[in-house]
Amino acid sequence: YGLYLIFNECIKHDDFVKIINSSSYTAHITGADGTKRDVKWEPTNYYAKGEATPPDNVTIIGGKTGTTKGAGNCLILLTKDSSGNPYISIIMGAGSKPLLYQDMTSMLSKI
């Protein structure tokens, strides 16, 4: 429930939604010592990478992946149905990446 609460607050900010819906994002960072550098992030979720296909009636906006030994493979997504209604979907503890996306696609097909 905690992940849902955090993600639900994040998606209230247009900049956050824009970033998670991007093919990549580059941040311009200035360190405490004044040095500047650019850091580029690219999505790791299989839907964004074209390695998994969502159901036809669902549009993936973006989300966050995470994997640890203790938590397993996890994914939280913002999606919209064909009428534009938003949904937050979470899968936690999947034993593998393929199973994670199989479970998420199955859940999204219920929308």
Predicted segment positions?
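Penicillin-recognizing serine hydrolase domain
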Residues: 1-111
